[in-house]
């Protein structure tokens, strides 16, 4: 597979990072070939000042950053042999590793959503005592909003099959209104489905006069924290510490995709 840098303050746009089932193909700092590629920051900033040293042999690929209070491994890409797929996972250092939501995605208890400068924390009610019910079946939804302009508000929604919970800018009739110019009129929609549980979708749908449905994507995206192992798909986009990457699954390498 390959990562391409499509936006960054520190890496050259168009930089391509190639990974196979053993790890980073070229220039690995760890050089372990264990199927895992660790991306992160070693604590030495662009001015060669030390923030907090993290040994380079813990990393495969170094992400240059001007300053970071918690250097170390930001995220990993790992090849899972028995599933013949790659996964992405945030490793709790840096400023978070977020996947861009292109289609509907499942929400899990304690999911973190980023839109504009706002963060939404997702929690399910405790009506169902089954701890394995991480997708919130038969549970109501609580959303906590974290942003300087929105005063950490909380919202609670009862499960109601196929009813849209609209999240977007203020004064546009949304269920959650956010005062942030980086956010679209309707930035994303959350919906409960009796079969799938709680789902989130970027943008909104408009029904045209001819009955067709037009998809309206948000301007700056809806992003979900990769707090669990997320299967990497072709053309998937994710961001980590002011870098945005596009994934490509390349046919014809020494493994089958």
Ranges and model annotations:
Residues 21-109, 157-241:
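Forkhead-associated
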């Amino acid at each position: 597979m390959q990562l391409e840098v499509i936006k960054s303050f520190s890496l050259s746009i168009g930089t391509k990072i190639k990974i196979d089932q053993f790890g980073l193909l070229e220039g690995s700092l760890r050089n372990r070939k264990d199927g895992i590629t660790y991306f992160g920051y070693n604590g030495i900033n662009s001015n060669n000042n030390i923030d907090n040293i993290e040994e380079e042999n813990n990393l495969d690929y170094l992400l240059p950053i001007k300053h970071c209070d918690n250097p170390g491994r930001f995220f990993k890409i790992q090849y899972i042999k028995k599933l013949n797929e790659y996964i992405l996972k945030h490793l709790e250092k840096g400023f978070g590793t977020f996947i861009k939501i292109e289609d509907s995605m499942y929400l899990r208890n304690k999911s973190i959503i980023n839109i504009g400068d706002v963060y939404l924390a997702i929690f399910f009610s405790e009506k169902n005592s089954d701890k394995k019910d991480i997708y919130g079946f038969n549970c109501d939804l609580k959303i906590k909003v974290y942003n300087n302009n929105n005063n950490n508000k909380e919202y609670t929604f009862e499960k109601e099959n196929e009813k849209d919970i609209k999240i977007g800018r203020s004064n546009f009739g949304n269920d959650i209104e956010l005062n942030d110019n980086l956010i679209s009129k309707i930035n994303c929609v959350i919906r409960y489905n009796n079969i799938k549980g709680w789902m989130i979708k970027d943008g909104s749908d408009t029904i045209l006069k001819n009955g067709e449905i037009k998809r309206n994507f948000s301007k700056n995206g809806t992003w979900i924290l990769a707090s669990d192992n997320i299967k990497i798909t072709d053309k998937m986009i994710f961001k980590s510490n002011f870098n945005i990457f596009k994934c490509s699954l390349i046919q014809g390498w020494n493994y089958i995709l």
